[in-house]
Regions:
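Intrinsically disordered or highly flexible coil/loop and linker segments, enriched in small
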Residues: 22-25, 59, 154, 158, ...
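Amphipathic alpha-helical interaction segments
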Residues: 11, 45-48, 52, 94, ...
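Short, solvent-exposed helix-loop connector elements
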Residues: 1-11, 34, 38-41, 129-132, ...
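N-terminal alpha-helical segment
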Residues: 60, 73-77, 88-92, 158-159
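Phosphate-backbone recognition surface of nucleic-acid-processing proteins
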Residues: 83, 89, 94-169, 173, ...
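Long, charge-rich intrinsically disordered scaffolds of nucleic-acid metabolism proteins
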Residues: 1-80
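Basic, amphipathic alpha-helical segments enriched in Lys/Arg and hydrophobic/aromatic residues
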Residues: 168-206
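Short, amphipathic alpha-helical segments that act as regulatory/interfacial helices
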Residues: 13-16, 20-23, 27, 31, ...
Length: 206
């Protein structure tokens, strides 16, 4: 069963994402209202709504930070995840909530769940087009991993090697970043399993 502190973290992260969507929707409505003949009363209402949503979002963000800082187990896990170059608080907390759920036995299962496994378009017996990510699973986590992969492909020695090798082979940059995202998932899974911080110079041996 999932530990209560992990369930709480997941719930807080979901609420934060929902609030972010609400903020964006309100901003869009406000922009539309300001460009049309919308009554000032409605515009003021939207402005108050946006202000309240931003305050609530900041409050939830603080609750998330406090929760992971004040729980010794979560803090230790988050520190392990953040030892990986490219993994910072945002993606670290998402991966923490996902990996500590207990439903994954391997990093490959996590990558498949997040839709990071390459698939090929097929038509009859022929393969059409380049392989692409399946993009199943939660898009919010995938989006944060993508941002982390952009950083890792420049500053993380292991991730950079994968990225540069694939681009040199003629792979599309987006496909190379997809491979970096998978690598980050494997690294995150690895540090939590071994309880050892990431070692940039570690080379896996067969």
């Amino acid at each position: 069963a999932t530990a209560p502190e992990v369930r709480k973290l997941r719930a807080l992260l979901r609420q934060r994402d929902a609030l972010r969507e609400d903020v964006q929707r309100t901003v869009n409505r406000l922009e539309k209202a300001n460009s049309t003949s919308t009554p000032q009363e409605v515009i003021r209402s939207l402005e108050r709504t946006k202000s309240w949503l931003n305050e609530e979002l900041a409050r939830i963000e603080k609750l998330i930070t406090d929760h992971t800082d004040n729980d010794p187990g979560l803090k230790a896990d988050l520190d392990l995840l953040k030892s990986i170059k490219g993994v910072k608080d945002q993606v670290g907390r998402e991966m923490l909530a996902l990996l500590k759920d207990g439903m994954f036995k391997s990093a490959s299962q996590v990558a498949a769940y997040l839709g990071l496994t390459p698939v090929e378009k097929t038509s009859g017996s022929s393969v059409r087009g380049r392989p692409h990510m399946s993009k199943t699973g939660p898009s919010g986590v995938r989006a944060k991993l993508y941002v982390a992969a952009l950083t890792a492909s420049r500053w993380n020695k292991q991730a950079k090697a994968i990225y540069e090798r694939l681009v040199a082979k003629g792979k599309a940059k987006k496909a190379a970043l997809g491979a970096v995202m998978r690598k980050l998932v494997h690294l995150c899974f690895g540090v939590l399993k071994t309880r050892l911080p990431w070692d940039e110079n570690y080379v896996a041996t067969a």
